[in-house]
Amino acid sequence: MNRKKLQKLTDSLTKNCKHFSKFEVKCLINLFYNLVGEVTERQGVIIGLDRNAFRNILHMTFGMTDDMIMDRVFRGFDKDNDGCISVTEWVYGLSVFLRGTLEEKMKYCFEVFDLNGDSFISKEEMFHMLKNSLLKQPSEEDPDEGIKDLVEITLKKMDHDHDGKLSFADYEQAVREETLLLEAFGPCLPDPKSQSEFEAQVFKDPNEFNEV
């Protein structure tokens, strides 16, 4: 990307991205093109991170291990659903992922947990996500029973209108009362250590830029 184009992109992203400074946006753009590699920009060719490349970043950099959650995080970043994360989606996505307000993070986490995109988190969705995050005990005859119990306990705590599923309003109320419930169904945000390490590595003088 030529300097003029890069400057224009940096300015436009900085204007619309309240959590990053111009310098930080520039660093994230640099990192994006480092990760994508040398790709010639051509008409009709999408330059971006595909699902595997992005999941690799989530795993290696932010320690995520749950395939289902990583897949949903990818979809959360890939706003236009073209199967690829563009440089704009990368910067906007990281803005919430790394530095979002509680409101932004609640909206993001709810979208991640709403597996089928119907604006509710159903019992089935809770079951699938909690099943992945719990370790099975070899002695358990029916490990699913414990997960079903956990789903019922979670609903009791979070389902404020008692309709057997979680709307965003239910989820928001529960999280505002107890912020630990933000990632109730699995880690989909970076832990503080990964976040500070990532930022320390990326937000430095571009002249001494290394890949993360």
UniProtKB/Swiss-Prot annotation:
Amino-acid positions noted as binding Ca(2+) 1 in the UniProt annotation, renumbered to this chain: 78, 80, 82, 84, 89
GO annotation, biological process: cilium movement; outer dynein arm assembly; regulation of cilium movement; regulation of flagellated sperm motility; regulation of signal transduction
GO cellular component assignments: cilium; outer dynein arm docking complex; sperm flagellum
UniProt KW keywords: Calcium, Cell projection, Cilium, Cytoplasm, Cytoskeleton, Flagellum, Metal-binding, Repeat
Tissue specificity as recorded in UniProt: Expressed in trachea multiciliated cells.
Principal place of residence: cytoplasm
Binding site for Ca(2+) 2: 114, 116, 118, 125
Protein name stated in the entry: Calaxin
Organism: Bos taurus
PROSITE patterns registered for this protein in UniProt: EF_HAND_1, EF_HAND_2
Subcellular location: Cytoplasm, Cytoskeleton, Cilium axoneme; Cell projection, Cilium; Cell projection, Cilium, Flagellum
Pfam family, one: EF-hand_7
